[in-house]
Amino acid sequence: MQNLKKARLVLQDGTVYEGTSFGYEKSVSGEVVFYTAMTGYPESLTDPSYKGQILVPTYPMIGNYGVPVDDEENGVSKFFESDKIHCTAIIISDYSFAYSHWNSQKSLGQWLKEQQVPGLFGIDTRALTKKLREHGAMLGRIEFDNISVPFYDPNEDNIVAEVSTKEVIEYGHGKYKVV
C-alpha cells in the first residue's frame, strides 16, 4: 500500500474538509467550483477555462481509466483540451488507484504529480457541491502539513491573457476557410 498523506480543503467561510492526497503535495489556493460536464477528467483538467480553480467533479469515482496517450490528429490533441493541466487542484470523492483502459499510459495520480497539481480524495463531494450550489463559488485552499497559503481569487487576474496563445496557430490547409 502506498504511503498516503492527509491534507485538508479550507473554504473562505471556515468550513474544513479532510482528505487524502493522490497528487502533488503542495499547499495551493483558488476558486472552488463544481462541474457536471459529461466529459472525461483529462479533458476537464486541461481545459484552460479552469485556470486558477480547484475542481470538484460531481461524478463520485475518478481515475478508473487512467490518462490516455497524448495523441494528435491534424495537429489537435485527441484527448486533451490543451498541452497541460490548468486547474489549481482537483477534489474527488473516490480515487481509483487501479486503472484500466486500452489507451491509458499512466494513472491520474502520476499525471498530477508530473504536472505538480494537488489532488485530494475521500472528501464528501456531494456535501461540498451542495454548499457551492447554495452559496456560489467560494475561495478555498488545500493545506498540507498545516502549511497555509493566502486565499487566491483568479477573478482578479486576466486569466484569458495567461492561457491564450501568443501567436496565430493554423490547423490544416483545407479548401475552405473557417472563421
Where are these regions (language model features)?
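RNA-binding accessory domains that recognize and position tRNA/RNA substrates
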Residues: 1-179
